[in-house]
Swiss-Prot record:
Function per UniProt: Part of the Sec protein translocase complex. Interacts with the SecYEG preprotein conducting channel. Has a central role in coupling the hydrolysis of ATP to the transfer of proteins into and across the cell membrane, serving both as a receptor for the preprotein-SecB complex and as an ATP-driven molecular motor driving the stepwise translocation of polypeptide chains across the membrane.
Residues involved in ATP binding: 87, 105-109, 512
Protein's UniProt name: Protein translocase subunit SecA
Organism: Escherichia coli O9:H4 (strain HS)
One Pfam family it belongs to: SecA_SW
Highest classification ranks of the organism: Bacteria, Pseudomonadati, Pseudomonadota, Gammaproteobacteria, Enterobacterales
Name of the gene this protein is made from: secA
Length: 901
């Protein structure tokens, strides 16, 4: 009560921010007549003038009024569009490292030109981040004339572009691209073998469009580049045959997992657990199939991988539904994004889940992948010096933006008042009753010429509504993951009188729905239209536009509440753009997923008390409140998951930054001989200490063991025993010095053969390859540690602290291994002629190019939240790293010729 009173007196923080910024808007407006007097050349010359002022030490913020006034005037001349005052406010919010909440249709794309221009003046580059390639290309091409008029360069960063084209795109003043592509380029740059292979500059300013989708919805999905691991597709097929014999348990006794069924499903956490009966049955079936030996337990250490296959197969059958979570197209399982309803070509679930779904659907099973490099969006975007974003719905997630990204949210007012009518929810007992009510509402609305947009949460639901509309004889368009090639065109015409469009979630986001349809799309469909044709199309559109406004504007129907209020608000936000008329209503049933999981008992009890009859709906503030509470529960749970993922990833992030920093230093120097000499001393000291403990008696020395170790690991055949026999006075310290001196001498002889320059080149290559190899193994070890660390909680230990402690120990051990393996490899390698070294380098480059061409980046999403992976196939290897080396040495390939690949 007191807070509300204070807010009334002093205004909210949002009000105070906007009040401060409106003073600057007044200054910009006062400059408008002065800007109008400038010629095109004088206006273009302002960019060079601003840059000169910045070089002399002027602060960027001081340029805001004049720079924004220049962009507004340039926009008037190039596009014939003038930035509204609210767009100037939005531009200032975005420059202040904030999230700007701007309603749909308020011109976010044009608003973004203001801070993009201002921050591009520094010459450090601006990255405009969009949710898909179509929007990146559209926005770049639409805004290119404006930026080029002002003397700035524009680049587009798309998947599959060759490195030189990417480098050129990143060198531009303003670069447009998707969040995935920026993240993957960062990871690829940190896997490069020479400075020339890198494409990104230092990360300066990121302007994220649809920021809620990228920084929140996708925050649980780490970007991962991975290569193929061993083939286990046959095992997935064999285990898949067993699963249909298991029966799902309806009521789970979480304490004992006892009951009639064989497995229980927890829909909240998206997990499946075997019951005791299920464990007995599955062990019998595994023995019968010859997969497991009689008398063995599925939980024994020897069967860990088998348990992994069983769990993945159970989840595939019990939790993942065709045409809801994925579709099958051209013999491939393609994931459907739960947030947008779009298909995500190439994206793959991790932990063997995708392979299990492929086995379930009977399509070809692709190999599992091994992580080569990874980063979460949370940690990638925090690498930028300056981060800002815009969306139509951010206020509900303001706390998360603030706590994780340190970004304040500012709600920017609309240019015209919002007059859309948001009608109360209607709740029915069954889904069939709900669908029937939706059909009746659509009939009523279209009869008076009102366009309707129906939002569904899955392809399955969109097809269900579509079938019912077809039966009722209502013409409609379906926009879902199966047919989104012409997405923008369908969305653009969704405002046509009496048009009915069914869209999964927020498919088509980024394209405005214009009342009366898009006259521009009609003009674009004609070949060489005349002025008369264009005028007629415009006149026809105006008649349609007025008719739709008269009918009540665009009506939004939500067929279910989403887990997040923000997604519901996004659907509603498609109507009522720029002060247009509109309305919205959500239809719910007690069979909806959200109601069933979170609100069913309380609300259904309430409905029974009210004596509900079939076909009747309940419309009451209590019900609306119960639904809002259910959504808050889910949002809170999802926030906790994302926060927990970040806390764990922060540990890996510190290590990642250390490794990538070290790696970049290595790439940028040509001579690492000093580092090698320092490492050699450390390695030989540690090796000798293991056999000749410091300050120990000679009887405690293991000379045969030391000789064997030096021979096997460093190719040093030293007669240490003879030295000690011939020189009894030879003490420990002198012996250490002699062994080290011998190793240096042998190494110098190698250097004389190939030349110092070649040896420096080779040393650098070995260090980089060894670092990459060990880092890859370390990532896998960290992943295993992360998966089981929660069990430490049963021993009254804090899993996060345990994870930090153990991962640090593993990291320290990896650095020691790095030193040892670098010196071991350099000591054992036999190089005879400079030509051989050159040939080796040529082979490595050709192989790197081949792998780069074969690389298919794919983004995975795992509902279990903590670990998902974005896989990049990097080609098949003929010899596995742990296979015997083909040279016949008897050693593992990775410890022999694999070093030189």
């Amino acid at each position: 009560m007191l807070i509300k009173l204070l807010t009334k007196v002093f205004g909210s923080r949002n009000d105070r921010t906007l009040r401060r910024m409106r003073k600057v808007v007044n200054i910009i407006n006062a400059m408008e007549p002065e800007m109008e007097k400038l010629s095109d050349e004088e206006l273009k010359g302002k960019t060079a003038e601003f840059r000169a002022r910045l070089e002399k030490g002027e602060v960027l913020e001081n340029l805001i009024p004049e720079a924004f006034a220049v962009v507004r005037e340039a926009s008037k001349r190039v596009f014939g569009m003038r930035h509204f005052d609210v767009q100037l406010l939005g531009g200032m919010v975005l420059n202040e490292r904030c999230i700007a909440e701007m309603r749909t249709g308020e011109g976010k794309t044009l608003t973004a030109t203001l801070p993009a221009y201002l921050n591009a003046l520094t010459g450090k580059g601006v990255h405009v981040v969009t949710v898909n390639d179509y929007l990146a290309q559209r926005d770049a091409e639409n805004n290119r004339p404006l930026f080029e008029f002002l003397g700035l360069t524009v680049g587009i960063n798309l998947p599959g572009m060759p490195a030189p084209a990417k480098r050129e795109a990143y060198a531009a003043d303003i670069t447009y691209g998707t969040n995935n592509e920026y993240g993957f380029d960062y990871l690829r740059d940190n896997m490069a073998f020479s400075p020339e292979e890198r494409v990104q500059r230092k990360l300066h300013y990121a302007l994220v469009d649809e920021v809620d989708s990228i920084l929140i919805d996708e925050a649980r999905t780490p970007l991962i580049i991975s290569g193929p691991a061993e083939d286990s597709s046959e095992m997935y097929k064999r285990v898949n045959k067993i699963i249909p014999h298991l029966i799902r348990q309806e009521k789970e006794d979480s304490e004992t997992f006892q009951g009639e069924g064989h497995f229980s499903v927890d829909e909240k956490s998206r997990q499946v657990n075997l019951t005791e009966r299920g464990l007995v049955l599955i062990e019998e079936l595994l023995v019968k199939e010859g997969i497991m030996d009689e008398g063995e337990s599925l939980y024994s250490p020897a069967n860990i991988m088998l348990m992994h296959h069983v769990t993945a197969a159970l989840r595939a059958h019990a939790l993942f539904t065709r045409d809801v979570d994925y579709i099958v197209k051209d013999g491939e399982v393609i994931i459907v994004d739960e947030h947008t309803g779009r298909t995500m070509q190439g994206r793959r679930w991790s932990d063997g889940l995708h392979q299990a779904v492929e086995a379930k659907e009977g399509v070809q099973i692709q190999n599992e992948n091994q992580t080569l490099a990874s980063i979460t969006f949370q940690n990638y975007f925090r690498l930028y010096e300056k981060l800002a974003g815009m969306t139509g719905t951010a206020d509900t997630e303001a706390f998360e933006f603030s706590s994780i990204y340190k970004l304040d949210t500012v709600v920017v007012p609309t240019n015209r008042p919002m007059i859309r009518k948001d009608l109360p929810d209607l709740v029915y007992m069954t889904e069939a009753e709900k669908i029937q009510a939706i059909i009746e509402d659509i009939k009523e609305r279209t009869a008076k010429g009102q366009p309707v947009l129906v939002g569904t949460i899955s392809i399955e639901k969109s097809e269900l509504v579509s079938n019912e509309l077809t039966k009722a004889g209502i013409k409609h368009n379906v926009l879902n993951a199966k047919f989104h090639a012409n997405e923008a065109a369908i969305v653009a015409q969704a405002g046509y009188p009496a048009a009915v469009t069914i869209a999964t979630n927020m498919a088509g986001r980024g394209t405005d729905i214009v009342l009366g349809g898009s006259w521009q799309a009609e003009v674009a469909a004609l070949e060489n239209p005349t002025v008369e044709q264009i005028e007629k199309i415009k006149a026809d559109w105006q008649v349609r536009h007025d008719a739709v406004l008269e009918a009540g504007g665009l009506h939004i129907i939500g067929t279910e509440r989403h887990e997040s209020r923000r997604i519901d608000n996004q659907l509603r936000g498609r109507s009522g753009r720029q002060g247009d008329a509109g309305s919205s209503r959500f239809y719910l049933s007690m069979e909806d997923a959200l109601m069933r999981i979170f609100a069913s008992d309380r609300v259904s009890g309430m409905m029974r008390k009210l004596g509900m009859k079939p076909g009747e709906a309940i419309e009451h503030p209590w019900v609306t409140k119960a639904i809002a509470n259910a959504q808050r529960k889910v949002e809170s749970r999802n926030f906790d998951i994302r926060k927990q993922l970040l806390e764990y990833d922060d540990v890996a992030n510190d290590q990642r930054r250390a490794i990538y920093s070290q790696r970049n230093e290595l790439l940028d120097v040509s001579d690492v001989s000093e580092t090698i000499n320092s490492i050699r001393e450390d390695v030989f000291k540690a090796t000798i200490d293991a056999y000749i403990p410091p300050q120990s008696l000679e009887e405690m020395w293991d000379i045969p063991g030391l000789q064997e170790r030096l021979k096997n690991d460093f190719d040093l055949d030293l007669p240490i025993a003879e030295w000690l026999d011939k020189e009894p006075e030879l003490h420990e310290e002198t012996l250490r010095e002699r062994i080290l001196a011998q190793s240096i001498e042998v190494y110098q002889r190698k250097e004389e053969v190939v030349g110092a320059e070649m040896m420096r080149h080779f040393e650098k290559g070995v260090m980089l390859q060894t670092l990459d190899s060990l880092w890859k193994e370390h990532l896998a070890a960290m992943d295993y540690l992360r998966q089981g660390i929660h069990l430490r909680g049963y021993a009254q230990k804090d899993p996060k602290q345990e994870y930090k402690r153990e991962s640090f120990s593993m990291f320290a051990a990896m650095l020691e291994s790095l030193k040892y393996e670098v010196i071991s490899t350099l000591s054992k390698v036999q190089v005879r002629m400079p030509e051989e070294v050159e040939e080796l380098e040529q082979q490595r480059r050709m192989e790197a190019e081949r792998l780069a061409q074969m690389q298919q980046l794919s983004h995975q999403d795992d509902d279990s939240a903590a670990a998902a992976a974005l896989a990049a196939q990097t080609g098949e290897r003929k010899v596995g790293r742990n296979d015997p080396c083909p040279c016949g040495s008897g050693k593992k390939y990775k410890q022999c010729h694999g070093r030189l690949q």
